[in-house]
């Protein structure tokens, strides 16, 4: 992906983070007093182009400022020129996007979701109820009508459906950080170049103009050798 997805002209990019864990959840890790950086919560940052559905960049790390900057630097390498970018309300994006993409003249906004407090009757696995969203322009002149993270959030669901290790209640979670990273790399490459998107009826790579055919699994494996 790094060889083929770079300096692309894009129009609208959406970014989000997907939670997972390696070995054990962060709360369990804290209870055991472990300081092993290769276990615990693992966040996958994803940037998707709204129209081609191409995954432009991804990053596996913690939900920290350092990893957010590492992710936005990858997005900067994958793109060129001005475009609109929308993220969720994670505060680290405000500096990271401007630092990595400000020179390209991007129009940056955040979609901040507002949640209601969980009633006592709900279980520990029940998601908080979203009661609304707030569109917050951060940099440049983003079009309010285009401020959305719907497409990347739909893609997050596809990720969870495609990889059992990312489902919330599972015994198939990753046991090693390297294995999760390798699985994500394979998934994103397959998604971009091999998997026909149901809406587009071609692969995202074909729609984005970086491939002229649907890749077979064999071709994908040869390209990574």
PLM feature spans:
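Residue-level recognition of single "structural anchor" positions
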Residues: 1-225
């Amino acid at each position: 992906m790094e060889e083929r997805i770079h300096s692309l002209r894009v129009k609208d990019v959406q970014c989000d983070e997907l939670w997972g864990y390696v070995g054990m959840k962060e709360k369990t890790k804290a209870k055991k007093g472990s300081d092993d950086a290769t276990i615990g919560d693992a966040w996958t940052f994803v940037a998707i182009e709204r129209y081609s559905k191409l995954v432009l960049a991804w990053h596996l790390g913690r939900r920290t400022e350092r990893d957010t900057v590492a992710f936005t630097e990858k997005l900067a390498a994958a793109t060129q020129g001005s475009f609109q970018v929308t993220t969720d309300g994670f505060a680290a994006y405000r500096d990271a996007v401007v630092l990595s993409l400000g020179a390209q003249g991007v129009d940056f906004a955040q979609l901040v979701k507002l949640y209601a407090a969980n009633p006592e009757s709900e279980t520990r696995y029940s998601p908080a109820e979203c009661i609304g969203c707030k569109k917050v322009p951060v940099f440049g002149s983003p079009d309010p009508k285009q401020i959305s993270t719907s497409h990347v959030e739909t893609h997050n669901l596809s990720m969870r459906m495609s990889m059992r290790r990312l489902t919330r209640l599972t015994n198939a979670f990753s046991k090693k950080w390297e294995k999760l990273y390798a699985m994500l790399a394979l998934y994103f490459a397959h998604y971009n170049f091999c998997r026909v998107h149901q809406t587009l009826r071609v692969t995202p790579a074909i729609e984005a103009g970086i491939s002229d055919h649907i890749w077979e699994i064999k071709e994908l494996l040869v390209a990574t050798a």
